[in-house]
Amino acid sequence: MTGEKIRSLHRDQKPSKDEDLLEPDEEATADGTFTRTSKLKSSKMFSNHKVIRSPSNPALLQNHHHHHQQQISPMTPGESKTDVYFPVHECVIKGDIRKLSSLIRSHNIGQKDNHGNTPLHLAVMLGNKECAHLLLAHNAPVKVKNAQGWSPLAEAISYGDRQMITALLRKLKQQSRESVEEKRPRLLKALKELGDFYLELHWDFQSWVPLLSRILPSDACKIYKQGINIRLDTTLIDFTDMKCQRGDLSFIFNGDAAPSESFVVLDNEQKVYQRIHHEESEMETEEEVDILMSSDIYSATLSTKSITFSRAQTGWLFREDKTERVGNFLADFYTVNGLILESRKRREHLTEEDILRNKAIMESLSKGGNLMEQTFEPVRRPSLTPPPPNTITWEEYISAENGKAPHLGRELVCKENKKTFKATIAMSQDFPLEIESLLNVLEVIAPFKHFNKLREFVQMKLPPGFPVKLDIPVFPTITATVTFQEFHYGEFEDAIFTIPDDYKEDPSRFPDL
């Protein structure tokens, strides 16, 4: 990826595919709901959900347990959208549970229709519990989003059936764990083949919200990699779009250990450590559902449909391509054009009291208030009164124009916002590491949400070289400038990757772990 040296041939780079790079805050909630207490799981620093990049062709989304499902052909150019048959979707809208049972083993239940909905989306929107539970029993994907950027979990929160929200949340976590376990052998193999090295990078966070800018952090991260072990030293313990928490923290990944023992976090000030676990108690799940039901539903995507990279220029009279040193590395600077941040916020499931309380918390935080000081405790939320029964027929739904699907479920209360994201990226031909190697390392430390954003961004088709400095969107109102300042190969003491003898285990040190 770093091979080509002829810069003049690459003045303008265009990605090969359209990808939505910015997921909502990668919490256990998976839908970017604004979270409000550091004591609860929904504001986790370490989420057990990694970004699972969906194939660009929705028809390739396979049901996890059925590798030999019948493929339904996607539309071809010139073909009418009603010519493509979606029998599973039709069963769900018609509430035909018997026919759905007969089709479910032979059809791709993760397929999207021409509105981007999967059968699970439709079942949840319509409040069809029988169909939804049958689809979940066959591992229908929960994280997948429709054309408007909403997952089945988001639609379940809107509908307001507590039991359904809980079932989807549990299935989402199960699927995320399975995805991590599936990737593990490939990841360990890639790490083993990679040389041992030290990498230092700097994070500088900014916001276009004036009051927020002054409370945003910066962070110098040190990454050590040896064999299949990784250590990350950081001062930024937790960072969401609403708060940051500072400290002296080390995150250690031991590839030789059992999956449940692989991850440990050291608090170097308190001299305690905590293992990262993925299982949650019944109470934690219930608290998370309470927060989901009392918060905005949020979706944010970074659209790359029209993205281009053009060489940045320098000089007043005689303009020339900008090439400067970043740390120890000579780099070509590019301007990133055509990135659009699209965000949507829904609140049809909230009461006026919820909205006022959420607004007060956000105002307190924007003035520098500490989330830890908030006295908010979630109230156990009952199910909402269901919306009026659906009267839209299958024919009306499927024949509707793409992007204008008849609304199913509770009447929408939605705000949309589009913002052009201006960014610069510096690519170096001298950097010893390849992007693919960086992606493998970032995948290990993806539980840190801001690192996950970096991993998503560098998966784009970038100009030639290694991105030694780049601007990335981390949250809808927050961007980060990431600078790779130092890199060298070398060997390290084994002690770097082990828990010091004088550290004590404290399973409750990080309540959100």
Curated annotation (Swiss-Prot):
Keyword NAD on entry: no
Alphabetical keyword list: ANK repeat, Chaperone, Endoplasmic reticulum, Membrane, Repeat
Disordered: annotated segments: 1-34, 55-77
Primary localisation category: endoplasmic reticulum
InterPro entries: ANKRD13 (IPR021832), ANKRD13_C (IPR055285), Ankyrin_rpt (IPR002110), Ankyrin_rpt-contain_sf (IPR036770)
Gene3D superfamilies in the record: Ankyrin repeat-containing domain
SMART domains assigned: ANK
Subcellular location: Endoplasmic reticulum membrane
Pfam family, one: ANKRD13_C
One MF term in the entry's GO annotations: signaling receptor binding
Ranges of compositional bias, category Basic and acidic residues: 1-19
SUPFAM superfamilies (alphabetical): Ankyrin repeat
GO cellular component, one term: cytoplasm
Biased composition (Acidic residues): 20-29
ANK repeats: 83-114, 115-144, 148-177
Domain of life of the organism encoding this protein: Eukaryota
GO BP term (any one): protein retention in ER lumen
Membrane-crossing segments per the record: none
Functional summary from the UniProt entry: Acts as a molecular chaperone for G protein-coupled receptors, regulating their biogenesis and exit from the ER.
Entry protein name: Ankyrin repeat domain-containing protein 13C-B
Source organism (scientific name): Xenopus laevis (African clawed frog)
Organism classification: Eukaryota, Metazoa, Chordata, Craniata, Vertebrata
Gene, per the UniProt record: ankrd13c-b
